Amino acid sequence: MPGPVDTAKSITKKRKRKHGGNGRATAETADDASPLPAAENGAVTESSAKKEVKADKKSGKEKEKALKKRKVSHSSSDEEEEEEDDEAATSGPVDEASDDEAEVEEDGSDNEDGDAEDKNDAEAADLPSMDAVRLPTVDGEPQKFTELGLSEKTLKAINEMGFETMTEIQRRTIPPLLAGRDVLGAAKTGSGKTLSFLIPAVEMLSALRFKPRNGTGVLVVSPTRELALQIFGVARELCQHHSQTYGIVIGGANRRAEAEKLMKGVNLLIATPGRLLDHLQNTQGFVFKNLKTLVIDEADRILEVGFEDEMRQIVKILPSEERQTMLFSATQTTKVEDLARISLRPGPLYINVDHRKEHSTVEGLEQGYVICEADKRFLLLFSFLKRNLKKKIIVFFSSCNCVKYHAELLNYIDLPVLELHGKQKQQKRTNTFFEFCNAKQGTLICTDVAARGLDIPAVDWIIQFDPPDDPRDYIHRVGRTARGANAKGRSLMFLQPSEVGFLKHLKEARVPVVEFEFPASKIVNVQSQLEKLIGQNYYLNKSAKEGYRSYLQAYASHSLRSVFDVHKLDLVKVAKGFGFSTPPRIDIQLGASLSRDKKQQQQGRRNYGSQPNGKGLKFKRKYED
């Protein structure tokens, strides 16, 4: 078995022997600069007493200058540190405690002489290997967290988070993970799997006494930035009484600030695939040689949005010896099985808490659909939102441009909504996500970027204005409500008369839905005012055209061609739904091939309907990380 955990200093030492020079990946800061020469270096060749006196005076002045320069260096270094922290706070949060601890470790490694390196090596040798560590073992299936034998610090954090009794996925996965087993888990969204993998990970870091200089010991890979931020928030609460550092690296955030944090040492790291691969390949001060645990969350979603190649490269780069891997996926596809094969050790434990359930969706969720012509869809949505202003609602659309248009329109006519989609800058996405999480009421309109894994409190309604790509996407969308024990929620899906065949696929997927009826007298008819507004407002007209085009493109790229056939759409009615009296002239080429991203997505799906035959519309990438 491998020896003790290596330190950043020992890795630097090896790099020095191999490449020469100082072996450091980045330029030294003012703090790391060595002091100016001492007095003995001032006049080593002088022999007369007079010259020695002059040398002493000169040496004393040099000492004073060096001391002043050292103070200035410390001051400027601190200011730079504060600026970087501000940058990190606006782009992607990293624990403030990790900065302090990492600074201490860096300061302790400035001395380049052999004695200091031997001392660091000796300290690293004191860290036990995985074989020498005994994590708690549990007999039977515990019901409460206190029965797991966890450390006092972890139990205190769990208690402060308000958790006492475990969910089924937690009862069945935490004990084998504490025992060091590799796990392939499947559970419904909202089942509590985040704590299932974070608790064993934090216990392992604590037992091995990981320090910032030891680098990253636990790596969690997430499909979307919002889900990564959410996992980071849970990790921050769970680690609040531990000394280990934690952080996050995601696309759209400040890469330089992230690299600085990684070089200081982040023991528990949450990341999205693209940005993680970037740091693994290009941030040389990023120490991941001591990785002990790899968590891949929402693996099926990661592969669907086109990160298959990145995940294969990541798994290949990361050390595999003595590494525990946890792979969680809501559905088991061929690609997920392939990823499990290359990432998990032989004989993993497969845990599925859903296969015995009668329904694929959670209890407490009332699910319905409404059959509505295309020209009446917006009128029904407007009427529904107007009557439920005191509720917390999420509305799903098929494309970013559809979200942008409807957000601009609804806000313009004094029906306030928030928008979330992949074309927004990361800071805007983050602010919107947390604003809606903290709101007691309001409406969020979004693409499927918000459909997977996000734990948004107390959502009353899920509205699927545009149809999901298949039953799995439907399940993940409605999973944003009725989260947690005894929680309640409702969902409503809009279907056109030509789309009722989708109900058969939902039934096969064990999804119970009933038809909701909305009396015509309850629907506010604002069609004439809508058409007048779109005709007179240049910016809304332009946005409506973009939304109309994107809707048709997304519809044509649907995986269930037998149900969602773009050639069966009544374009006059569809255009009216976007506020046009007649369909606008737009540049769409029928018969064009699907994009590479959509092909990858559809190849990874199960046969829920007819497969792509190469006929469709050109469209832009539907999903964003």
Curated annotation (Swiss-Prot):
- For this chain the motif DEAD box maps to 297-300
Q: Where in the cell is it found?
A: Nucleus, Nucleolus
Q: Please list the residue ranges that the record marks as compositionally biased, kind Polar residues.
A: 601-613
Which spans does this entry mark as compositional bias, Basic residues?
11-21
UniProt keyword list: ATP-binding, Helicase, Hydrolase, Nucleotide-binding, Nucleus, Ribosome biogenesis, RNA-binding, rRNA processing
Q: Which portions of the chain have biased composition (kind: Basic and acidic residues)?
A: 48-65
The keyword Signal belongs to this UniProt entry's keyword annotation: no
PROSITE patterns per record: DEAD_ATP_HELICASE (PS00039), HELICASE_ATP_BIND_1 (PS51192), HELICASE_CTER (PS51194), Q_MOTIF (PS51195)
Question: What is the residue range of the motif Q motif?
Answer: 143-171
Q: Where is this region: Disordered?
A: 1-139, 591-625
Q: Which GO terms describe its cellular component?
A: nuclear envelope; nucleolus; preribosome, large subunit precursor; small-subunit processome
Q: Name a biological process GO annotation.
A: maturation of LSU-rRNA from tricistronic rRNA transcript (SSU-rRNA, 5.8S rRNA, LSU-rRNA)
Q: Which Pfam families match?
A: CTE_SPB4 (PF13959), DEAD (PF00270), Helicase_C (PF00271)
**Biased composition range(s): Acidic residues:** 78-88, 96-116
Q: What is known of its domains?
A: The Q motif is unique to and characteristic of the DEAD box family of RNA helicases and controls ATP binding and hydrolysis.
Can you say what this protein is called?
A: ATP-dependent RNA helicase has1
What organism is recorded for this protein?
Answer: Aspergillus clavatus (strain ATCC 1007 / CBS 513.65 / DSM 816 / NCTC 3887 / NRRL 1 / QM 1276 / 107)
